[in-house]
Amino acid sequence: LNIGTNDATFVMLSEEPEKTEQLFEEKYRNFLKLLRQLNGSETKIVCALGSIDYYLYDRICSAVEKYRKETQDLKVYTMKYTKMLSMGLDVGSCFHPSKSRQEKMAEELVKFLKKQVIE
């Protein structure tokens, strides 16, 4: 998963950002439960964030930690992509990651999977 970047803007602009962050974390944890239910107990899930923004990364880590404690499901991991540069080759359309940045992200993910996930 790599979700939460666009949610950061919604959270920051909400009337009560702290409550909205808590709600995001709760909904993220519920989403993990649904993913597990739909994909079975053997599926490994990587909860990533980046490379544009990390505003909700701590909330994602907290959601994963709470989920793991609650369910004893140790096949859920967190990963933080390297932050992209705000100018130059990293930037594509509408300030989203360019093709070359996405290729770098794919390399990061493969390295993470080999080191942390694949047994």
What are the functions of these language-model segments?
Residues 1-119:
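Alpha-helical cap/lid subdomain in secreted, periplasmic
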